Amino acid sequence: MNLKQFTCLSCAQLLAILLFIFAFFPRKIVLTGISKQDPDQDRDLQRDRPFQKLVFVIIDALRSDFLFDSQISHFNNVHQWLNTGEAWGYTSFANPPTVTLPRLKSITTGSTPSFIDLLLNVAQDIDSNDLSEHDSWLQQFIQHNNTIRFMGDDTWLKLFPQQWFDFADPTHSFFVSDFTQVDNNVTRNLPGKLFQEWAQWDVAILHYLGLDHIGHKDGPHSKFMAAKHQEMDSILKSIYDEVLEHEDDDDTLICVLGDHGMNELGNHGGSSAGETSAGLLFLSPKLAQFARPESQVNYTLPINASPDWNFQYLETVQQIDIVPTIAALFGMPIPMNSVGIIIPDFLQLLPNKLASMKENFMHLWKLSDHHGEVALDDFTAEDIYTKMYTIQETLTKSATNYNYPLLTLAFVGFLIITIIAIYVLLRYSGPDFWQLRVSSLSVLLVSIILGVSTFASSFIEEEHQLWWWIVTAFSAVPLFVYRLNVLIIVRWFIMMACVRSIKFWNNSGQKFIYSNVMSNLLNQNPSWKWCLNMLTFLVLIMASAGFQVLHFIVTTILVGLCFTYKISWEIVNGNQAEIPLFMHDLLAKIDFAPTESNLIVLARVFFQAWAIVVISRLVLTKLKVLNKNYLIKDMKVYITILLMFQTSSQNIGQFLVFQILESQIFYFFQNIPTASLTSTSKIYFSNLVSLILQNFTFFQFGGTNSISTIDLGNAYHGVSSDYNIYVVGILMSVANFAPAIYWSMLPWSINYASIPAQVKLQTFIRSKLPAFTYHCIFGTCLMTACVVLRFHLFIWSVFSPKLCYFLGWNFVMGLLNGWLPELALLCALD
């Protein structure tokens, strides 16, 4: 197989994956049109509606305990309003995927999200996100000639036309490094655009992002979280005070909610209790005139809850229930695609609660493909709600229609590619079955083990355990291949110690969390952490000292920039107390002031310097100005520095362990008995070991198969608020796949160090076959599992995220990282 054929095969594989994903995650079929009422009925409802103004406040990632739990909540004014009955509180269940765009669609239309909205959450410029033709409570307000003003997350303007808003001041939602200015940009408009012009608007939408950004950076227990709670609480008080001043003019409802929650790492996107349990609050002086929700009467806020409450405070409602509730409270018809149910506590506010219940029931009845009227006269309110909850459950479960023809095409195409990949892998091993090498059979064995595991949701959630067992098994190989002596045994023990250290470094998987892991110990002892980080950087510099003087100088400069940035980043983000004093003195001596603006400049200087160094090294080697014998070592050092730059401080020390482990593995490959391996077998084995370590370290870096553990905190180095989504995407990919990228370089020195130039391309193709075959076999099993288990309880929370990760591994590691750096290296070596 030549390079052109293999390139076509790889592109076809990626295309088949994309086709399968878009067939498996189709856009939901929604009803077109806008709900309307009889003109006379509409006029009466508008006249008698309980509220005239709506202030809709979204505090991004406002988890339920942030509002209600005494151990973490600092919303003191909210607690007071809840206890006086001016506010009614709930825990709202947010259907996964728990990211902003699909949650906003649900909150405004009342429909359940499709999983493809998770992908569109990043690609927010796609026209299909537009809800201007879909019914929503915003559409209903527009139809009833209400004026809407908006401030906050610019995702709203990707969903709704800007001309719908009398005033709009958007802020970027993905710039997670900022959690101060992003909220000030919203609050600055309150005096002028809301308070002073109170009579000029009917609906105000405020979407605050700062709390979510703090979660992404430091988690729910961040030192910044209490102050952010108090800031949001004071903003709500200022709005409520303004409502009280205008109490005689109109009735205003303030609705405060989180679009989703967050997990204990501060991330979201998955289906854990913390991510799906968002806080919900309705606030108005009028509410004090009615009976409080029964669940609220029994408690004095804040609540001292026990851990087994699992974020369920007061009464739990579906987040989509907000939509018909708002529609009823403002005398509007329920949006066309809403599957929500009016929150029962609000029926007492409605002028005709029985009619509202019946309208809600008939709306759901028709959505469930039933036709004709239903006699509800003999049913009690409880009976009607019981039936509505049953219909709602059915509608939310049957929200997806699969594109079976496209699924079949994609799967058959991928299966054909898999058969070709296995054939090519085995053909290079030997001319017949009896000459098949252990190396190729090992590739198939690992692929089949991981592939079969995809049929069990628990194995997907705890995939790291499988890689741990495989790493442990392969670590025993040197004991059987080499003639044992003291040196071999010592190196083997060092290798095992490194593997165990990596396993101990972070929590991995989704089911169990342990407190005594290395990353937690380092965070609790920051002086140890930074001494270890400094040692890691120094070892990298010293490792380059034996090559060339120019390389040593360049490495020292890059390491200096990287280390200075990592220290400065901690200081700017409020962790200056964790930085040892001598490092503060170091910054003072180089006259660098750690500020947010200086951080952006420093990061850009690093990236530019790194790019110049890498490109220059490749070009000068190609021109034979620099010695090509050191090119592979030099490039590995430069790439490692970039990976450390994109790594969180508690994980930088892992690269020291990586370097020690790599040196032991390299020794074993260099000294393997000649009779034990053919050249092809050596290529296969080195790349199989690389593949195993890529996956093993990915999980031990803190990665999982859940969307919620994607690292966004390191995706904005050098990025200002006016960011480029493609740059952020590249930085995010490097940050999340940093350990995998490191181990993808392992075979370079083994496979390319001493082979003739004319066989380098064939070596490249053979080196890609193990990973390519693995992804083909694993992907075939995963696709089969997704189709067979498409009605499984965990299809959206476990299998679908894994499908997205599979795409990421193939695109980032298989295509971008697997091809571009290595081909550039081979081109320079010619």
Curated annotation (Swiss-Prot):
InterPro entries: Alkaline_phosphatase_core_sf, Phosphodiest/P_Trfase, PIG-G_N, PIGG/GPI7, PIGG/GPI7_C
Location within or outside the cell: Endoplasmic reticulum membrane
Residues with attached carbohydrate: 145, 185, 298, 506
GO molecular function term, any single one: CP2 mannose-ethanolamine phosphotransferase activity
Homology family: Belongs to the PIGG/PIGN/PIGO family. PIGG subfamily.
Gene3D superfamilies: Alkaline Phosphatase, subunit A
Annotated protein name in UniProt: GPI ethanolamine phosphate transferase 2
Membrane-topology descriptor: Multi-pass membrane protein
GO biological process: GPI anchor biosynthetic process
PANTHER family listed in its UniProt record: GPI ETHANOLAMINE PHOSPHATE TRANSFERASE 2, PHOSPHATIDYLINOSITOL GLYCAN-RELATED
Matches recorded under Pfam families: Phosphodiest, PIGO_PIGG
EC numbers on record: 2.-.-.-
Miscellaneous information on this protein: Present with 259 molecules/cell in log phase SD medium.
Pathway assigned to this chain's UniProt record: Glycolipid biosynthesis; glycosylphosphatidylinositol-anchor biosynthesis
Residues annotated as signal peptide: 1-32
Role this protein plays: Ethanolamine phosphate transferase involved in glycosylphosphatidylinositol-anchor biosynthesis. Transfers ethanolamine phosphate to the GPI second mannose. Although not essential, addition of ethanolamine phosphate to the second mannose plays an important role in cell separation via the GPI-based modification of daughter-specific proteins.
Record topology, Cytoplasmic segments: 343-405, 461-469, 555-598, 673-682, 746-768, 827-830
Primary enzyme class: transferase
Lumenal face residues: 33-321, 427-439, 491-533, 620-651, 704-724, 790-805
Membrane-traversing stretches: 322-342, 406-426, 440-460, 470-490, 534-554, 599-619, 652-672, 683-703, 725-745, 769-789, 806-826
PTM (free text): N-glycosylated.
Keywords: Endoplasmic reticulum, Glycoprotein, GPI-anchor biosynthesis, Membrane, Signal, Transferase, Transmembrane, Transmembrane helix
Gene Ontology CC annotation, any one: plasma membrane
